[in-house]
Amino acid sequence: MLKNLRLRNAVLTLAAIAGLLFTTNDVTAQNATLYKTVEVDGIEIFYREAGAADAPVILLLHGYPTSSHMFRNLMEDLSDDYRLLAPDYPGFGRSEQPPMAEFDYSFDNMAHIVDGFLDELEVETFSIYLMDYGAPIGYRIAAKYPERIESLIVQNGNAYDEGLRDFWVPIKKYWNEYTLENGKPLEGFHSPAGLKWQYTHGVKDTLKISPDNWNLDLQHLTRPENNEIQLALFYSYRTNVPLYPEWQEYFRTYQPPTLIVWGKNDYIFPAEGAHPYKRDLKNVEFHLLNTGHFALEEKGDEIAAYIDNFLKKNKVQ
């Protein structure tokens, strides 16, 4: 009898374990990152998506010269509770690169494409993760649809004159004198050495930064005409600066809950650009992290925890 009881208990235990495994696998499958495309204004936009369809949306906007690849780990970390959407802009990552003769590579147009992306996916309300180029793209959308923005997550994304320092000196020269001669030095920023520098400068432990990052970026940047596209966007960045007062007014008027997670050693967008947010925003959580421009590469777990706690604290759920 004891033998039969033990056998019965063993069977029940195995069944319970199997059920747990099936449940875990179901959850894992539901939250796995998916790799999709959608057509926006006739352009094929590649994007990553993770999390349940009915979960609160976080729109992840990448910077220069990268792609949605920069969010790969963050999406896994947050997908249990949020729906994460990370598009590649035209000419970046795996999205289509229309010829410059047929497409306006400007920040106004990039924001228009992301706006259309949200429409295609029928996204109504959302939080935005704004990094580097993602900031001027995202702030255009936030200022246009303030009622749709649940919160802002700002990671080395600028909206103040104080944030444009030494790195921007040759770029400002390009704005003032739009010539091939002034554009040529800027190509170094997306050269193999320049890409590696962007990922490793200001990082505490460079051995933790995978070279796959800049090798993948380089693969996309070496497409025909992509160098010219990057120079066009350097020139277009000048159109963001006159909009800073408008975005700052948006902060003051609508007071979106805002999380600042900023790599304080960033040479491109230094910490001087992070502090002014505190002037205009009342509900702001502020963290300067001991890392560089691509803060997620070294501080991804820390940033994910800050985001999760911040959104739950502000009842974005």
Spell out what each predicted region is.
Residues M1-T13:
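Bacterial N-terminal signal peptides that target proteins for export
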Residues V11-L21:
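Bacterial N-terminal signal peptides
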Residues M70, Y89-F92:
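Recognition helices and adjacent regulatory flanks at domain boundaries
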